[in-house]
A protein has these predicted regions:
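Charged DNA-binding/catalytic regions of mobile-element recombinases
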Residues: 1-281
């Protein structure tokens, strides 16, 4: 493009002919004369949709934007999405790396082969616009990446943890294992006893081994990047509404790369597996 502009500049000032300018500057005359065809209305609409989705989801890369377009019925290549995003300056900045925690295990699950085989839970913190602390308990099914619950409180005690787990079990079934760090809420005797009575085994990650709890760490990174860092949370009530909306979006609308760019809900529906599968011990 710069060489074409140089040829146009030289010819425009009458310094030499097009033929000579192209020869000196190494530009083929057909290349110089080429003018891009105007985009068809459908292509313009597609371009605008790519830009709109990229602005709507600023932390989504080109693969996830392409998956969203496919959900809407658009047929678009990877390079086309990359080209438009590069032209519009919509490149996603690298995400910051996350750090996790750890805990005495009664089971040793590795990778969940089905829903409700392994759940994982942890805490994440944030602040309201006025500086008040928000403590959030997050709960995830490792197989489907489905977020089962995000409980938002000022403080979370063992009773809150048990009630949130009980609520998730009433709607999603009973997990065989729960993976977590060694947080005081998770190793509390009350929780240990309750889990044992319900035949739920525990898997505590080793100290300083965040990769052992990679699912929840990845979820927290996404949760902070796409929700907490973008929203002004005025108070606890608003935080609960905003975060629950995001949780539903993550489960029902957001394409997940590890699920073949399906949403967790669609992925589970495609498996044709009952949510009670984890109860078959």
């Amino acid at each position: 493009m710069q060489k074409k502009q140089a040829v146009a500049h030289v010819v425009g000032h009458g310094l030499c002919s097009v033929r000579r300018a192209c020869r000196y500057l190494g530009v083929h005359r057909s290349t110089y004369r080429y003018r891009a065809k105007p985009l068809a209305p459908k292509q313009i609409q597609l371009h605008q949709r790519m830009v709109a989705l990229s602005w709507q989801h600023p932390r989504y890369g080109y693969r996830r934007i392409r998956a969203l377009l496919a959900q809407e019925g658009w047929s678009v290549s990877r390079k086309q999405v990359q080209r438009v995003r590069r032209k519009e300056g919509l490149k996603v900045r690298p995400k910051p790396q996350k750090i996790p925690r750890q805990g005495v295990s009664t089971g040793l699950p590795t990778q969940a082969p089905e829903p409700n085989q392994v759940w994982t839970w942890d805490f994440i913190f944030d602040r309201t616009n006025k500086g008040s602390t928000l403590k959030m308990l997050t709960m995830l099914d490792e197989y489907s990446r489905r977020c089962l619950a995000i409980r938002v409180e000022r403080q979370i005690q063992s009773e809150h943890v048990l009630f949130t787990l009980w609520q998730a079990m009433t709607t999603d079934g009973i997990p065989r294992y729960i993976r977590s760090d060694n947080g005081s809420e998770f190793i509390a005797q009350k929780i240990q006893t309750w889990l044992r009575e319900n035949q739920i085994r525990t898997r505590y990650i080793d100290p300083g081994s965040p990769r052992q709890n990679g699912y929840i760490e990845s979820f927290h990174s996404r949760f902070r990047d796409e929700c907490l860092n973008r929203e002004w949370l005025l108070n606890l009530r608003e935080a609960r509404v905003v975060i629950e909306d995001w949780r539903q979006h993550d489960n029902e609308e957001r394409p997940h790369s590890r699920l073949g760019y399906l949403t967790p809900e669609t992925f589970l529906a495609n498996q044709k597996v009952s949510p009670e599968v984890g109860q078959n011990r």
